[in-house]
């Protein structure tokens, strides 16, 4: 309620430029009406404080943000216009620069949703997202990766697959996301057993040591625009098809993968609910991947019911360990799917002849080699810990 804010037309949720000693950031303005701040005083969030290197009593300057010209392209998309590569570059650069408010981000996400992006637009969006982030390079002709479109509870195959594939000698720098529309993302589950937040340099060190990793992609800056968009998508409970493809493939290209397996569960309550939707998504992934220089393989899997027994990070982690430890009561559906995915990757990664991938994957799991590799990767990532159990439990017996 400062008179300066009023005279300048600053309102709540306005995007403004905050400057201190030659450093400037874009911040969202919140206005308080209590006496916690005096006239001509402002407080900063912890992240803004750190980025500016501010100290108590410093004098900051506030100014209006220049007009965000790329918003004109978002408005064009809302009205059904096709966007060019340059226009997507402009939008994504402004998103990463913090020039978009949450409302404006929501409008962009919505404008691109419900099949509003052509294949070429998805290519442009993906390339724009890659340009704004860091890219890793590996001195190997084949670098494999996988992604599950998700949409079904459980389905936590990634740690098992990474362990098997890395144990076979392939390079698999696996990054995963946190939950968007489910109780747990792969990164959330792995975090109950080991650390997942690393810099790009640390990832390179871990992979050089063990051939694979299991990290949270959001800490790497591989596709910073995607991390910003996912934060808003989570609130909206949306995962638009075009942006999902751009999200997945931008991070696969940025991590340095050459061969990527896309697991697409199809079922009545999954994200993909019909063969028609599967074939359309398969075509999108293949065509966009080819434009990026990626060998993309898609696999239709059963999405009619949950996979594994546990739902939530800790319980899903217990399922993973049961499979890796070859326990008698390990969930057979999770085990079989992980083996089938690993088998395909071993074959296109040229570690097994066509049709022999499953036998090699099964051998590596059953003889304990995969478990040893999993533990070694965890140690390289800061050490392994058993996933904890909840303080309170309740047995619910089947009738």
Residue ranges and their predicted role:
Residues 1-79:
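Long, compositionally biased stretches
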Residues 189-213, 283-289, 293:
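A glycine-rich helix N-cap at a beta->alpha junction
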Residues 159-171, 251-256, 291-292, 348:
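Alpha-helix C-terminal capping segments
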Residues 208-259:
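Phosphate/diphosphate-binding glycine-rich loops and adjacent basic-rich segments that engage nucleotide
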Residues 109-113, 146-147, 186-189, 224-234, ...:
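Active-site-proximal beta-alpha loop/turn segments in soluble metabolic enzymes
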Residues 80-85, 95, 239, 258-399:
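Well-ordered secondary-structure scaffolds
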Residues 142-166, 170-182:
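Glycine/serine-rich anion-binding loops at beta->alpha junctions
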Residues 66-153, 373-381:
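Acidic, glycine/proline-rich low-complexity segments that act as flexible tails and inter-domain linkers
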